[in-house]
Amino acid sequence: MELLLSVEPTQRSIHFDNQTITTFTETYEIPNKREICFVVHELVINAVEAMQQMQFTEVKEIIVHVTKDVDVLKVTVTDEAMGIPEEKRSCILEANFEELDYSDRGRGFLFIKHMVDEIWFENLSNNRFLVGVKKKITI
């Protein structure tokens, strides 16, 4: 089973992705629906915010790809905002709740890493950046 979305980096796209992933998880009776929806929501928000900071003059896209095998759900979100610098990735993945402050930034990945089994980052060609997560699911 597979879901592929290509959206512009806008608030409207965040709302569309939220509705789509909610429908997907409900229709296919995927366990941990709320967690999955939250993870996708946070990944898409990060991509939208990163691309809006780039202030592109031409239309760019965010790709949301969800695949479900028998026991694994895989989600990737790809944007064109050049990604998270290599040296900051380990800080993101090693942060913990004791270090959490009340700023508006940086909390999404902290929650995501506790809701999934695997998270990774990939620099792709032409300033494209991918964040992927995997979650084991049992029905």
Regions found by a protein language model. Give the residues of each.
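Glycine-rich nucleotide-binding loop
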Residues: 83, 125-133, 137-139
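A conserved short beta-strand within the histidine kinase catalytic ATPase domain
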Residues: 57-66
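Short, highly conserved beta-strand within the GHKL-type HATPase_c fold
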Residues: 65, 71-76
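Glycine-rich ATP-binding loops of the HATPase_c
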Residues: 117-125
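Conserved ATP-binding N-box helix of the HATPase_c
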Residues: 31-58
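Bergerat-fold GHKL ATPase/HATPase_c domain
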Residues: 1-38
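Glycine-rich/acidic phosphate-handling loop/turn and adjacent ATP-lid/helix
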Residues: 77-103
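Glycine-rich phosphate-binding loop
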Residues: 101-116
